[in-house]
Regions:
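Bacterial N-terminal signal peptides
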Residues: 8-21
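Extracellular beta-sheet/turn segments enriched in Thr/Pro/Gly and aliphatic residues
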Residues: 25-31, 121-158
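A short, amphipathic beta-strand motif
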Residues: 39-45, 153
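Exposed aromatic-hydrophobic patches
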Residues: 84-91
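Acidic, glycine-anchored loop motifs typical of Ca2+
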Residues: 103-112
Length: 159
């Protein structure tokens, strides 16, 4: 009996020894080079802890917003319901934009329905309305100051 308890204790300690560093690393492990300006993005309304959350950061340039190969950085975080959080080190204080999608099937594509509507959850900084089209850049642009800026976005699922 004593050896079974001892084995269980050592198994638990071994798990904690290996799991704790991994958990600790994700808490403050921000994308980018450490700077004086940090952005924390809290994605709410996550309906399932499956797949990953693609959180993309764009510079203050309307022509680069949602354009291919125009992002400043992207975090692909394991989706956690009901909230997934990620952070970025920003190059400097200024204006930025964020776009998010919930890649539930993990194929690294923003899937659409047969008629072109989003098949996966999505969100933008400032949570602008998106009834029939993508929001204009001016609606998603936000200011990040020196130190830490926190924003919250709410996922929308159309299906």
């Amino acid at each position: 009996m004593k050896s079974a308890s001892t084995a269980a204790l050592f198994t638990s300690l071994a798990f904690l020894a290996f799991a704790t560093p991994a958990l600790a690393a994700t808490a403050d492990d921000c994308e980018g080079h450490e700077s004086q300006t940090k952005l924390t993005v809290q994605v709410t309304g996550v309906r399932a802890a499956r797949g990953e959350m693609a959180i993309t950061l764009y510079p203050d340039d309307a022509s680069r917003f949602l354009a291919p190969h125009s992002k400043l950085a992207r975090v692909r975080a394991v989706a956690q319901a009901p909230v997934t959080t990620a952070c970025f080190w920003l190059p400097a204080p200024g204006f930025y934009a964020v776009a998010v999608y919930h890649d539930e099937n993990g194929n690294r594509d923003f899937d659409r329905t047969m008629v072109g509507l989003p098949a996966e959850g999505f969100a933008f900084s400032n949570d602008p309305p998106t009834p029939t089209a993508l929001p204009p850049f001016r609606a998603v642009r936000f200011s990040a100051g020196e130190g830490e800026t926190r924003i919250r976005v709410k996922l929308r699922y159309l299906k």
